[in-house]
Amino acid sequence: MSYLNGQTGYREDLLNTRSVVKMGSYAVIEPDGIVKNAIPGYENCDVTILGSPSMGASFADYLITVHENGGNPSFGGEGLESFIYVVEGSITVKNEDEEATLTEGGYIYSPAGNTIAIKHAGTGDATLFAYKRRYVAVDGYSAHTVVANINDTPWMPYEG
């Protein structure tokens, strides 16, 4: 059953699903297996956990629908780097370094400890992909905030 595709109830048996979670390896969640999760800090949002450390991942990622007046004042956390990508709709984002309005294809990367405030903008719902993980430093490099839109990136051949 899923709130995203309107499929409710179970296929044939109670708790029957085609989703597969192999702890520490992978998770494949079919559309009928997507459920809403109650996560503190999200107001007027539908949040689905796609992957998390409790599933064996080294990160957490989410599919978020932000409704009017919705958002989260603090996505990320101490020691966590975070990333938000706008699948559709419009949001405003703000961290210690940048404030921007993101539309479809827009994204923000925020370095460890620099949380992102997310707020609905425009009309209609906004759909986001959100990702966070424990930051692993690389000697000689430091992370910085990046705000851009994939639609502004020139196409280039990937495999040569």
Give the positions of each predicted feature:
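Short acidic-glycine-tyrosine-enriched beta hairpin
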Residues: F83, E96-G113
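Double-stranded beta-helix
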Residues: Y3-Q7, A121-G160
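Short histidine-centered beta-strand/loop micro-motifs
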Residues: N72-E78, K119-H120
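Long compositionally biased, domain-poor regions of proteins
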Residues: E68, T92-E96, A100, I118-H120
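A short glycine-rich, His/Asp/Glu-containing loop-to-beta-strand
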Residues: I34-P73, P154-G160
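Transition-metal
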Residues: M1-C45, D61
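Short, conserved beta-strand element in jelly-roll/cupin
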Residues: T65-H67, G76-V93
